[in-house]
C-alpha cells in the first residue's frame, strides 16, 4: 500500500494487476487501483478535481485531468473517508502513476493534496513463456 498525507488528509492507494484483462500477445496490460481518502482534520473538505501523471515502462507520460473521481465530488466531514476503484491500461508490462486532488474547504479555500506515486507491475514482467 502507498500512502501520502497532506493537510491532515490521508490518501492510500493499492494497485492490483488484472491478468484477465491483459494480453501480452496484444501488448496490453491492465491494473485496477483502489484509493481511500480519509479526512483526519477538523474541517469539512470537498474533492473538486483530479490530476494524474501516468508513466509507462519506457518513460512515455500521459497526463489526465478531470472533475471529481469516478463521477463524484465527495464531501468529507472530519473523520469520514471515501473509497473508490478505477483502472488504467498500459502498453508496457510496468509503469507508475502519481498525482494530486484539488480540494476545497468549507470556507472556499482551494488546495492540492498529494496522491502517492505507486508502481504498476505485472507478475511476469511481460515475458512470454514458451512450453
Curated annotation (Swiss-Prot):
NCBIfam families: PRK05461.1 (NF003967)
Residue stretches in coiled coil: none
Ranges where the ApaG domain occurs: 3-127
GO BP term, pick one: error-free translesion synthesis
Protein name: Protein ApaG
